[in-house]
C-alpha cells in the first residue's frame, strides 16, 4: 500500500458535492495524520468554513497546484455511480462516496456539515421577511421544481432525465400552496409565473450564489423539491422537506428514513434505472421520459404532504 497522501477529486453538481462531504469527514477522522487534499472540479462552495475540511480544499485551477502538491500524491477520483451497492439500490449517494473513499462497506453516516456565515444567514432572513411582507403569509416554503437536466426550448420546459416537475403542474401546485404559504421558487429559468397562470406574486430570486440559497433555505419553514440540490441542503441544515422523485430511486438520492423528510415516489414500479456515468441506456431514458407528469389528484397528494409535514415538524 502506498504511503503517499491522497488527493480526492470531487466533480459534479452541488448536490453531489454535498453528498461527498460525510465520506470525506470520515476519512479525516480515520486518517488524522494524513495530509490529504480535496480538489474540487465543480467549486468549493460547500466546503467553505468546514471545521475539518476547509484547509484541505482546492479549486482545480489553483495556481501551481500540480507542481506544488499533486505531483507527490496519489490521485483518486471517486465515482459513486459505479459502486455496485448504488446501482443495485443498496445504498445512498453519500454511502457510495464512503464506499469509494473509505472502503468500509455500507454504514450509517451523519449529516454533512454545512457552515454558513452570519452574513449569509442574515441575508437569507431579510430576504424571507421581505417576501412575507409582500404576500402577507407567514408560512414560508422554497419550491425547487426543476433538476439539473432541465432545458428550456423556446417557451417549453423539458427534462430528458425525468427528474423535474412538469411546468403545468408547477403552476398548479404554486397556486394551491399560495392559499397559505409564501412561495419562493428556486430556479435559474427565466419564467414569468404570473404570465404562466399564477394568481399571486411569486418570489423568484435571480442570480443568487448557491450559498445564498442555502441561507434562504435555512430561514424558511420547509422546502418542496424534486431530485436536486435543495433537498441535500435541507438535509444538511435539518430543514423539513417534501421530496418528489421520478426517474431516480429514493434510497439512492434522498433520505427516506429521515423523520422530517417526506419522500413521494412518482416512479415506483415504473422507472428503470438509468446507468449514468456508466453507459448510455436509451431504453431506460425513454421509459422514464415524462415520469413526473401528474394529474390533479397527485398534485393534491403533494400539497397535502406539505401541510402534514408543516403541522408535524414546523408548527409548534
Functional labels for PLM-detected ranges:
Residues 1-51:
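N-terminal pre-catalytic "stem/leader" segment of glycosyltransferase-like enzymes
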Residues 34, 42-43, 48-157, 248-252, ...:
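Conserved nucleotide-diphosphate donor binding/catalytic pocket of glycan-assembly enzymes
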Amino acid at each position: 500500500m502506498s504511503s503517499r497522501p491522497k488527493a480526492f477529486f470531487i466533480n459534479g453538481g452541488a448536490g453531489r458535492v454535498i453528498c461527498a462531504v460525510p465520506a470525506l469527514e470520515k476519512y479525516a477522522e480515520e486518517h488524522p495524520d494524513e495530509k490529504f487534499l480535496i480538489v474540487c472540479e465543480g467549486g468549493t462552495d460547500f466546503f467553505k468554513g468546514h471545521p475539518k475540511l476547509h484547509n484541505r480544499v482546492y479549486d482545480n485551477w489553483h495556481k501551481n497546484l500540480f507542481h506544488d502538491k499533486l505531483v507527490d500524491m496519489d490521485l483518486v477520483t471517486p465515482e459513486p455511480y459505479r459502486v455496485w451497492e448504488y446501482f443495485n439500490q443498496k445504498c445512498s449517494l453519500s454511502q457510495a462516496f464512503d464506499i469509494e473513499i473509505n472502503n468500509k462497506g455500507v454504514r450509517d453516516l451523519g449529516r454533512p456539515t454545512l457552515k454558513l456565515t452570519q452574513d449569509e444567514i442574515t441575508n437569507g432572513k431579510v430576504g424571507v421577511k421581505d417576501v412575507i411582507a409582500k404576500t402577507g403569509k407567514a408560512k414560508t416554503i422554497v419550491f425547487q421544481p426543476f433538476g439539473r437536466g432541465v432545458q428550456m426550448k423556446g417557451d417549453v420546459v423539458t427534462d430528458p432525465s425525468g427528474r423535474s416537475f412538469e411546468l403545468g403542474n408547477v403552476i398548479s401546485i404554486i397556486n394551491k400552496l399560495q392559499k397559505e404559504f409564501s412561495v419562493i421558487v428556486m430556479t435559474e429559468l427565466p419564467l414569468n409565473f404570473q404570465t404562466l397562470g399564477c394568481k399571486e406574486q411569486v418570489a423568484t430570486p435571480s442570480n443568487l450564489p448557491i450559498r445564498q440559497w442555502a441561507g434562504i433555505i435555512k430561514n424558511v419553514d420547509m422546502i418542496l423539491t424534486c431530485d436536486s440540490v435543495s433537498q441535500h441542503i435541507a438535509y444538511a441544515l435539518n430543514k423539513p422537506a417534501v421530496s418528489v422523485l421520478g426517474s431516480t430511486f429514493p434510497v439512492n438520492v434522498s433520505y427516506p428514513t429521515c423523520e422530517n423528510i417526506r419522500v413521494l415516489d412518482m416512479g415506483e414500479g415504473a422507472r428503470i434505472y438509468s446507468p449514468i456515468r456508466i453507459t448510455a441506456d436509451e431504453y431506460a431514458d425513454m421509459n422514464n421520459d415524462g415520469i413526473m407528469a401528474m394529474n390533479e389528484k397527485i398534485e393534491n397528494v403533494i400539497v397535502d404532504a406539505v401541510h402534514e409535514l408543516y403541522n408535524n415538524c414546523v408548527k409548534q
